[in-house]
Amino acid sequence: MASATIKVTQTRSTIGILEKHKATMRGLGLRRIGHTVELEDTPAVRGMVNKVNYLVRVEGE
């Protein structure tokens, strides 16, 4: 059985945000506005998404 996944899309620019949040975006694999990645739905990924929730949109919850 495949594990659950979520789609995360970057909706805002990373210019002018905290360096920690930029690192989190890189950790999620997001590079530019409109970029979408499919990630496993784990507590670690959810924590990263919650940290930068003002920059991303999540689908498949």
Swiss-Prot record:
Pfam families attached to this UniProt entry: Ribosomal_L30
GO MF terms held by the record: structural constituent of ribosome
Record has Ribosomal protein as a keyword: yes
Record-linked CDD domains: Ribosomal_L30 (cd01658)
Keywords assigned by UniProt, alphabetized: Ribonucleoprotein, Ribosomal protein
PROSITE patterns with a match to the protein in the record: RIBOSOMAL_L30
PANTHER family (UniProt xref): LARGE RIBOSOMAL SUBUNIT PROTEIN UL30M, MITOCHONDRIAL RIBOSOMAL PROTEIN L30
Protein name, as recorded: Large ribosomal subunit protein uL30
Organism: Chromohalobacter salexigens (strain ATCC BAA-138 / DSM 3043 / CIP 106854 / NCIMB 13768 / 1H11)
